[in-house]
Amino acid sequence: MSKRDYMNTSVQEPPLDYSFKSVQMIQDLISEEPRTGLRPVKYSKSGKSLTQSLWLNNNVLNDLKDFNQVVSQLLQHPENLAWIDLSFNDLTTIDPVLTTFFNLSVLYLHGNSIHRLGEVNKLAVLPRLRSLTLHGNPIEEEKGYRQYVLCNLPRITTFDFSGVTKADRSTAEVWKRMNIKPKKVRIKQDVL
């Protein structure tokens, strides 16, 4: 199967589903069997999954150490990973490893322990990210939570399972002007 054929078919492929497996470390996925759904996951001749979706929700992960290496062992084309579900784990930060998947369009992080709103800024480098969930994290209690996320991730079209409207964008822009101070540019003065 060519890469082009893969890109056309794998979007409809079922996810590689490791949800509800009590996984504590990413490395444990290598020895764990994925859950089976209504449709079977397809595999390449080398034994790697031909999907673009990885579900790791409802486990006990507290970090993503070795995530790239493990994903490379599980997926035929890890660079095409488009959907990662890490909801309902014990993550306290948004690991920068997630920003290496430039085709990522759906990222579920709800129900974790992320407590710094600034963590969201890491995701700004993902050009295709359109759907993000963060509700159920301590950051949800921060004043201006929704506006902050929408200001920093302007390409998001769905946030916390709600569509982003023009009114949301407008409110976020007003919030940004009122709450985020522009960085001062220092002018270097020549001393004679």
Curated annotation (Swiss-Prot):
It is found in: Cytoplasm. LRR repeats lie at residues 49-71, 80-101, 103-124. InterPro entries: Leu-rich_rpt, LRR_dom_sf. Residues 137-175 form the LRRCT domain. Coiled coil: none annotated. Its main location: cytoplasm. PROSITE patterns: LRR. The keyword Cytoplasm applies. Keywords: Cytoplasm, Leucine-rich repeat, Repeat. Pfam families: LRR_9. GO terms for cellular component: axoneme. It comes from the Eukaryota. SUPFAM superfamilies: Outer arm dynein light chain 1. This is Leucine-rich repeat-containing protein 51. It comes from Rattus norvegicus.
